[in-house]
């Protein structure tokens, strides 16, 4: 069946679901089990939504899932309603990101009301990702990652909470909210130190915290590096710590060439990502007579 055939079938199912809802409101249905007609309508709306999905009519699919969700709420089937709102959100993601967020927020309300905080956290991440990629609103993405981290922490899912917090730290630093980023990197770095599995990544978090300190003030960065070396001796031997010391020295001497050379040398072994490049360029700009490029 081609898309137009699926679309037509979906429209027919919608009409059937609407008839069921109308019939459930009649006087006789009220006496003889109107709720079973509503249940049938829920099912038919969901079938229509899936048919719209097959026809790639994402908005219509989202609307049909929303209709099913509203009816589930009428029947006090909270879990089913939340599931339909999530399905609606996923359909709207492809057509109307703001509407996707609205549907996911409805689902989150239901899940938090039911005490299902882990699943609510997961949907806050989905909303944060829509703000990151579709709507490009970093402040709102941060807010949803923070909310997600709070819920995960409350449920003792610390590694999931830390993943969200690291997203917050990355964006906070980009927005020049350095102290906020430092607090998170230090907190996550300290907890990683105590885990045999995560120990290796602690140096990266202390490195990022040190770079944020450097963006505020060179002396801050110097003291931070000393603190991290005492706290986590393995940091001293890391390439990240050695790079920090070279950068501090270059900055102290106001030597752009040795700063660039140190970055180049590091980049030849560990490729710089976009975040590190941004931070290193910001620091480089505080050296007199800098040029725009890092390498």
Swiss-Prot record:
Membrane topology: Peripheral membrane protein
Annotated positions of the N-acetylmethionine modification: 1
Protein name: Alpha-soluble NSF attachment protein
Sequence similarity: Belongs to the SNAP family.
Alphabetic keyword roster: Acetylation, Cell membrane, ER-Golgi transport, Membrane, Phosphoprotein, Protein transport, Transport
Alphabetical list of InterPro entries matching this protein: NSF_attach, TPR-like_helical_dom_sf
Pfam families: SNAP (PF14938)
GO BP terms, alphabetized: apical protein localization; brain development; intracellular protein transport; neuron differentiation; regulation of synaptic vesicle priming; SNARE complex disassembly; synaptic transmission, glutamatergic; synaptic vesicle priming
Gene name for this UniProt entry: Napa
Role of this protein: Required for vesicular transport between the endoplasmic reticulum and the Golgi apparatus. Together with GNA12 promotes CDH5 localization to plasma membrane.
Modified positions (Phosphoserine) in chain numbering: 26, 29, 195
Complex formation: Interacts with PRKCABP, and disrupts the interaction between GRIA2 and PRKCABP, leading to the internalization of GRIA2. Found in a complex with VAMP8. Component of a SNARE-like complex that contains at least ZW10, USE1L, RINT1, STX18 and NAPA/SNAP-alpha. Interacts with VTI1A. Interacts with STX12. Interacts with GNA12 (via N-terminus); the interaction promotes CDH5 localization to plasma membrane.
Cellular location(s): Cell membrane
Top-level taxon of origin: Eukaryota
A GO molecular-function annotation: protein-containing complex binding
